[in-house]
Amino acid sequence: MQLLCWWQVLLWVLGLPAHGLEVAEDSGHPWREERPVPALQVGAVYLHEEEVAQDHRDQARAAEPMEASLGPRGDPMVVLSVVPGAAEDQRSPEAHDGTCSAQGEEDPSCGRENLFGLQGAGGFQDREEEYYAEPGVTEAEPVATEDANSTDSLKSPKVNCEERNVTGLENFTLKILNMSQDLMDFLNPNGSDCTLVLFYTPWCRFSASLAPHFNSLPRAFPTLGFLALDASQHSSLSTRFGTVAVPNILLFQGAKPMARFNHTDRTLETLKIFIFNQTGIEAKKNVVVTQADQMGPLPSTLIKTVDWLLVFSLFFLISFIMYATIRTESIRWLIPGQEQEHAE
């Protein structure tokens, strides 16, 4: 009797799955073809199908504010596969052409994977590259270059010189200061007129070669003043203005030195260029070095004079050598006498 009861229970248990399969076949919806199982996210475990459906509904509600902030969709697909190959297949043909930039330049940001798949909104990195473009990529306009060139050509002079009135003057010559004259007496400390001053020595061959060219400058620039002084006679002025070698040419505005001529080629043309670059005053045309400039007022030949400073230096050196020699001989005579006294 007990065996018969257990047998009926076993048949009833085995009959339930069979009865369910027949009902499913009659309705035309097999269990295995009812609907595909949704893709499981990494790290998520679902125990029942109701939990899966509920989870997808929660994700849809959470995605609605994000989609509203990013803008309208450019593609009906919401989530792409995280596999790069699957994401590239869903992209529009524009991304594969490399011409997504409006300027017609290839933008490397067009070929990146976007995990959100919202092409209408665009990636965050693409926006950053749009707002912060690399410097130097955009070519400068030709108009800006032309403006820069015109600005360089119209530069203001470094020294703003007040040109003197030359009305009624016909003879423009160089003035040479003697030993008793002071340079500051010929410069106006309260004015803005410019004067070119030459420090020279008559026994220097470089000063002599410069003399004809410097003598012709007053005719080329009649509105400027030109002075020359012997550096050996005005040693205090030479030290004051840093004259360590001659010839030395300084441009003064009033009583203030403004520029120094540092070229080794000291000719009339280089002096004209120097004055024009510093003051903006153009030289008169057809001014050349003449035979009169060779004669003076600045001498163009070496003047042979006695250098008394050199004579005094030689006399002092010879006297010191003679005194040292005499003292050395007397010391030699004293040393043997001292040795004899110690021996006794």
UniProtKB/Swiss-Prot annotation:
The chain crosses the membrane at residues 306-326. Glycans are attached at N171, N178, N190, N277. Residues 327-344 are cytoplasmic. It is found in: Cell projection, Cilium membrane. Residues 21-305 are extracellular. Keywords: Cell membrane, Cell projection, Cilium biogenesis/degradation, Glycoprotein, Membrane, Signal, Transmembrane, Transmembrane helix. PANTHER family: THIOREDOXIN DOMAIN-CONTAINING PROTEIN 15. This is Thioredoxin domain-containing protein 15. It comes from Mus musculus.
